[in-house]
Design a protein with these regions (language model features):
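Charged, low-complexity intrinsically disordered terminal segments
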Residues: 1-197
Length: 197
């Protein structure tokens, strides 16, 4: 990675799988790579210590917790972020059913032997994962990223090649309507790239 690394996972657990990843992310942050991580608070409620994001931020890793759990105050507790995404420089994306926890590499047998699927994607389709991550990041942090920077800095143009199709997931989150910038961007994308929705 030379520009950015984005990770978004439902479950993260400190251990043999995640700890070496943190070391790599910390090193990349020291090299000037923008590193961002999103985790779901309920997904990690039994696997991470409270305010884990502060430990990562001390290592130069920008971190956001999706929909923090507030007992007795949260009526939207079931609104969870089940995505499992890694994006590197907008050129490579990983996704699938695996989370960043030892049970996914069978270091811990929580439910017996575990085998999950994952894929590595390259090319123009990676932009879809980049923009999905940025929309979620902007929603959680109430910020507004310059999407053109991430697209133009790292995505090779494919000329007249056919764009990849993807399934919009904003219906699974409560992004639209709560973050005006994200809502505007989603509407703009539907107008500019209707074949993607």
């Amino acid at each position: 990675a030379r520009h950015f690394i984005f990770l978004e996972y439902f479950i993260i657990e400190q251990g043999k799988m995640f700890d070496p990843i943190v070391d790599i992310l910390e090193q990349k942050a020291k090299e000037g790579v923008l590193v961002r991580l999103i985790y779901d608070d309920v997904g990690c409620i039994q696997t991470l210590p409270p305010k884990f994001y502060l430990m990562l931020q001390a290592k130069g890793i920008h971190c956001a917790c999706f929909n923090p759990f507030r007992p007795f105050l949260s009526v939207i507790m079931n609104n969870r972020d089940h995505r499992k995404i890694t994006v590197i420089d907008g050129q490579i994306a990983y996704t699938g059913g695996f989370n960043l926890a030892d049970e996914y590499i069978n270091e811990k047998m929580k439910f017996g032997y575990w085998k999950d699927a994952g894929i590595r994607l390259t090319g123009d389709c990676v932009w879809n994962f980049t923009s999905m991550f940025l929309e979620m990041w902007d929603y959680i942090t109430k910020s507004e990223d310059d999407y053109a920077f991430y697209r133009n800095a790292s995505i090779p143009q494919l000329g007249n090649a056919t764009r990849n199709q993807w399934i919009a997931t904003e219906g699974n989150t409560e992004v639209e309507g709560k973050n005006p910038a994200a809502t505007k961007r989603m509407a703009q994308r539907r107008v500019e790239e209707p074949h993607l929705t």
